[in-house]
Amino acid sequence: MRLKGVLALFSFFTAIPIKSNASLEEIAEYSYISPLIIGISLALIESAVYVLLYRILEALAGIVLLGVVELLRGFNHLDGLLDLGDALMIKGDRERKIKALKDVEIGSGGIGLLLVYLSIQIVALLKLGFSFYTIFYLISSNVLSMTIGLYILSTISPIPESNLGKIFHNKLKGKSTVLLFELIPFISLYNIIVFLVFYMIMHKICRSLGGSSGDIAGASITLSFPLFLLTNEITNLNYSLLSILCYLFLHLH
């Protein structure tokens, strides 16, 4: 595994200032490990920031964390969410929807989907609270959301207009099983249901657009993160390997 390709994942998926001259093909080749490397790294940073903010702002720390979450991601996935929202609002043939997906202007559909995301995200972050489990909620949610975005790219053929989608699909189409195995320590019984339902919805959306794309993957990562986080908080990560390890740690020390 080349270090250059791994480090390039940080510059591609986040705003963390790591210089890399890796090509898009090299980034796509190693992207299957990004849920573990990038997802866990982001969760650790978010957890550290949240702990510091919570000491000052208490419950309101979640609102500030919203900005931190998007800032760490460089707002890249948020752009995909806005584009997908515009495409979903278009009535008519596929060409018009693709035009809206690739258009740089933001329409009412993009704003609407953004409001949906912000509503769920704010509720999830306000409910985060402060406990031993907080870091594990964030780790699980980051890993799961990144995985579902990449899993969509690996299992659904890209639209002809998406160069990024083609590159990632070619590099990931043999890695879908690996992506699912990476989930095992982090996914609970309840999040399996969320994962499957979310994937089926996105699969239907991809069919209406003619395939997957980088924008669709980015939108999936963005929108699924608060859903997984909220599920983790409500269920306390029950029936997951992480929850078992947490239980053993708390009761054996």
Curated annotation (Swiss-Prot):
GO biological process: cobalamin biosynthetic process
Main location (coarse class): membrane
GO MF annotation, one: adenosylcobinamide-GDP ribazoletransferase activity
Catalytic activity of the protein: alpha-ribazole + adenosylcob(III)inamide-GDP = adenosylcob(III)alamin + GMP + H(+); alpha-ribazole 5'-phosphate + adenosylcob(III)inamide-GDP = adenosylcob(III)alamin 5'-phosphate + GMP + H(+)
Annotated Gene Ontology cellular component terms: plasma membrane
Pathway involvement of the protein, from the record: Cofactor biosynthesis; adenosylcobalamin biosynthesis; adenosylcobalamin from cob(II)yrinate a,c-diamide: step 7/7
Keyword terms: Cell membrane, Cobalamin biosynthesis, Magnesium, Membrane, Transferase, Transmembrane, Transmembrane helix
Transmembrane segments: 33-53, 56-76, 106-126, 132-152, 178-198, 209-229
EC number: 2.7.8.26
Reported cofactor(s): Mg(2+)
Membrane topology: Multi-pass membrane protein
Subcellular compartments: Cell membrane
UniProt keyword annotation of Membrane present: yes
Pfam families the UniProt entry points to: CobS (PF02654)
NCBIfam families per record: cobS
Classification via PANTHER family: ADENOSYLCOBINAMIDE-GDP RIBAZOLETRANSFERASE (PTHR34148:SF1)
Similarity comment: Belongs to the CobS family.
Function recorded in the entry: Joins adenosylcobinamide-GDP and alpha-ribazole to generate adenosylcobalamin (Ado-cobalamin). Also synthesizes adenosylcobalamin 5'-phosphate from adenosylcobinamide-GDP and alpha-ribazole 5'-phosphate.
Protein name: Adenosylcobinamide-GDP ribazoletransferase
